[in-house]
Amino acid sequence: MRIETLDFSKFHVGTDAERYEFSTALLTGFANAGFIKLINHGFSQEEISQLFEENRRFFDLTDSIKAQIANEDGPKPQRGWSAVGAEKTGLLNTGGKTNLTKPDIEAPQDAKEHFDIGPSEDTEFPNKWPDNELIPGFQPWLESFYERSRYISFALMEALEIAMHLPKGAFIQKCQGHASELRLNHYPKITVKTLQGGKTSRIWPHTDFGVITLLAQDDVGGLEIQDKDNPTNFLPVSREDVSELVVNIGDTLERWTNGFLKAGLHQVTTPREIVNQSTETVRPRRSIAFFLKAHRQMSVGPLPQFVAEKTPAKYEDITALAYQQRRTAIVY
């Protein structure tokens, strides 16, 4: 299995033929691997580098300062800072199965902290920001990155509509509103021995809740995706270019397509080059993820186009917010 690298400019400014070629390649890449890489998407190398600098500036704040905008545990969209170990992703997809209730097992630990925001206009679940005097320019920079990421995500959904011969807006109209989220991740340095112990991982195998995810990652390594040709195996996904984005399918798109497209199971663990060196320390890792989400009151049950007598609905008809609440309740 391989991850295809697609040139977004072919869709954004290409001819009709190039747009269709990109669309079909996107669908094929998603169907084969659940993931693709995206280049020429509009973010320059300098802008992605600045994004990682904003990540560093935030997580360099003291825990006491970050705690002033801490996320409140519970079944709701996350906002603000979550400390190392607050989230328990090891409970989300035990045995590769997507859990909708918390399994009755001891939760393994996550060795990461993160900061989450939603849209600036969201009054139902408002954002929590550090004081601008402590980290000048942080909020407007992330708000701008959020909006541009949403634009790219909508364009990718338009491409899928084209490739799957769906009515215009079949996916995009369900994603309007105040639901998508942006997350900064920081994985502090950790020993290989700790990660090999089986009780702690940087992030455990899981699928994302939303429609699709755009991920920018640094060069530390450790991101791995499930090999669909050999589901017990995970394949490393290294960064080949500063500005590339890794794009994966989330639970919602799997549900909308009635399982035709499968959410991409992934994890962050010990980089392959030091996996057998138990005395080594894994460097801190940083990543930034944009999660395209459905409107909170939209159904995440299968679309009618994917349900037939021979392919009955595999997923229940519940709202996007109810689905997120079920999944979020598992990790806290």
Curated annotation (Swiss-Prot):
This is 2-oxoglutarate-dependent dioxygenase gloC. Disruption phenotype: Abolishes pneumocandin A0 production, and 3S-hydroxyl-L-proline occupies the hexapeptide core's position 6, resulting in exclusive production of pneumocandin B0. Keywords: Dioxygenase, Iron, Metal-binding, Oxidoreductase. 2-oxoglutarate binds at R285. Residues 178-294 form the Fe2OG dioxygenase domain. It holds the Pfam family 2OG-FeII_Oxy. Its cofactor is Fe(2+).
